[in-house]
Regions:
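Extracytoplasmic
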Residues: 1-223
Length: 223
């Protein structure tokens, strides 16, 4: 049975065994072999944890109403991966649908030279090739804390994935199923939204629409 009940409120989940970002960075730098963790990881005021391949982060959150919720996650790339991260998610030990197996956490890229905007209209100046034609600038990976709603990696919908939470305490597990060097932080749970319009609302919005009377203009569908 499909659950369509919408949850209520915004809640911050608690991260099991989370560590202060500055402490994490200092611990990494004590290992002389580590030279990839960016200083930007310390620009964070919540607890965090590192997820290498198949590592899991466990969160608990209490909600006052059962229903559908969006999940909003902070993350940062602290390794050398050039590909988007993929994580798998479970709620109370279960996966509610297959899309929870492949949730995307994108790597962020920016132009190598970010100071090439000129004029009040913010027009960008692109590098030129030997023929004087504009070419795409080189890209750098941005290693900063990023906040995102959780989407499946196919992005079949512009809306985030919805997760059913029971009333009371829920355990949310996030597993890294891609490359190492991923760190995650605060997980926020927000009530989902029902954007489905009723027939009455839809009809009211299109009350002035012209009916198709010519069969040549009619759209035929198989039902």
């Amino acid at each position: 049975k499909k659950n369509t009940t919408i949850g209520e409120g915004t809640h911050v989940a608690s991260l099991k065994d989370g560590i202060d970002a500055n402490k994490f960075y200092n611990n990494k730098k004590k290992d002389s072999t580590d030279d990839t963790t960016p200083k930007a990881v310390t620009n964070y005021n919540s607890t965090m944890t590192e997820l290498n391949y198949n590592d899991k982060a466990e969160y608990t959150v209490k909600v006052d109403k059962e229903g559908l919720y969006y999940l909003n996650l902070d993350y940062i790339s602290i390794g050398e991966s050039l590909s988007d991260y993929t994580v798998k998610l479970a709620v109370n030990g279960k996966q509610q649908y297959s899309e929870m197996n492949t949730i995307a956490l994108p790597i962020i890229w920016a132009d190598e030279d970010t100071k090439t905007y000129v004029g009040s209209d913010k027009k960008k100046s692109f590098p030129l090739d030997s023929y004087g034609d504009e070419i795409a600038p080189s890209q750098n990976r941005v290693q900063e804390w990023t906040n995102t709603y959780l989407h499946n990696n196919t992005y079949v919908s512009s809306l985030p994935l919805s997760f059913y939470l029971k009333k009371g305490v829920n355990k949310i597990t996030i597993e890294n199923v891609s490359s190492g060097g991923l760190a995650v932080g605060k997980l926020q749970v927000e009530a989902g939204k029902d954007n489905t319009k009723s027939y009455k609302e839809y009809a009211s919005e299109h009350s002035n629409a012209e009916l198709v009377k010519d069969s040549a203009d009619a759209l035929q569908v198989d039902a």
